[in-house]
């Protein structure tokens, strides 16, 4: 039934797009920024948008809508996508940050340039065509109906090291993968903003000023909008019993899809700051990062601060998802599979890891100048101003 409905929707979208393309010209001053991940501009989009907005001759259309639960929510989201076809058919540049169904089921106009600015920085966990027929990936049968990640003209990545992996994941040629830098990394070069964030945090939590603040940001375990299993595999109560009296505090930040599955209680050791601070603000505030398989490690490496990898389910994750690199030798920090080992890692002085983090950062984030948003915006503008293919 689901396959039948997908075919119907694909046919309707394709026909509507063809009709719009036949009737309407491409508007060479129009850029569309679209995402199903957020209801507003994300950190990655915001910097690019602000740069583009400086040119008053450009027309910028924002298409943001999350899919709500239930039949009505899905129907409303589908209607939103259908209405978006007008903008897809008339824009010169389409900028995305994730999976975008309408683009994959229409015969994209040659004059339209589709650019994928993937939401994750760097190539870490496998995705796209790298995990076909795996639990987290598309099935071969689905790809016959919906060729996901098709119709991209370019993808933008953080470094040359990521190029072959994104080419594999999107089934693109390497020359189409451009290491211009990831716009949201510009955050770490806005020193005045970071100072303001730190001052405001210490005013809000003066008791934490002299404590060691550990940011816990576990990866989203699931596909689509659905979290699989426990959102916080780390036993925070056990961690508290070991570290609470040693001037540590844990700041929790969860992926939006993970919140309803989280079983945490705030106290003087664990603070869930997901709704209060952005992930990047918490990175700047923190003294160290605890994570597992999150691509946040790329951005965090810019801070040159310790990272601890708590991975009790590593073997299972390798089977279900896998990575583009051998996990143990790739991550720039100690790996633990139980809380006592994690505590030992946190309390140890890992001088060697500081050098590893520096090397990791230089390899996987080439542009460390705070100008990635500008480079991406300039690349987009080159199509909007020239009007050429």
From Swiss-Prot:
Gene Ontology annotations for the cellular component aspect, listed alphabetically: plasma membrane
Pathway linked to the protein: Cell wall biogenesis; poly(ribitol phosphate) teichoic acid biosynthesis
Enzyme class: transferase
An example molecular function term from Gene Ontology annotations: CDP-glycerol glycerophosphotransferase activity
EC number: 2.7.8.46
Coiled coil ranges: none
One BP annotation, GO: teichoic acid biosynthetic process
First-listed, main subcellular location of the protein, grouped into a coarse class: membrane
InterPro entries per UniProt: Glycerophosphate_synth (IPR007554), TagF_C (IPR043148), TagF_N (IPR043149), Teichoic_Acid_Biosynth (IPR051612)
Keywords annotated in UniProt: Cell membrane, Cell wall biogenesis/degradation, Membrane, Teichoic acid biosynthesis, Transferase
Membrane topology classification: Peripheral membrane protein
Keyword Membrane found: yes
Compartments it resides in: Cell membrane
Catalysis: reaction(s): 4-O-[(2R)-glycerylphospho]-N-acetyl-beta-D-mannosaminyl-(1->4)-N-acetyl-alpha-D-glucosaminyl di-trans,octa-cis-undecaprenyl diphosphate + CDP-L-ribitol = 4-O-[1-D-ribitylphospho-(2R)-1-glycerylphospho]-N-acetyl-beta-D-mannosaminyl-(1->4)-N-acetyl-alpha-D-glucosaminyl di-trans,octa-cis-undecaprenyl diphosphate + CMP + H(+)
Annotated family: Belongs to the CDP-glycerol glycerophosphotransferase family.
Function: Catalyzes the addition of a single ribitol phosphate unit onto the glycerol phosphate of the linkage unit, as a primer for polymerisation by TarL.
PANTHER family, sorted: TEICHOIC ACID GLYCEROL-PHOSPHATE PRIMASE, TEICHOIC ACID RIBITOL-PHOSPHATE POLYMERASE TARK
Protein name per its UniProtKB record: Teichoic acid ribitol-phosphate primase
Species in which this protein is naturally found: Bacillus spizizenii (strain ATCC 23059 / NRRL B-14472 / W23) (Bacillus subtilis subsp. spizizenii)
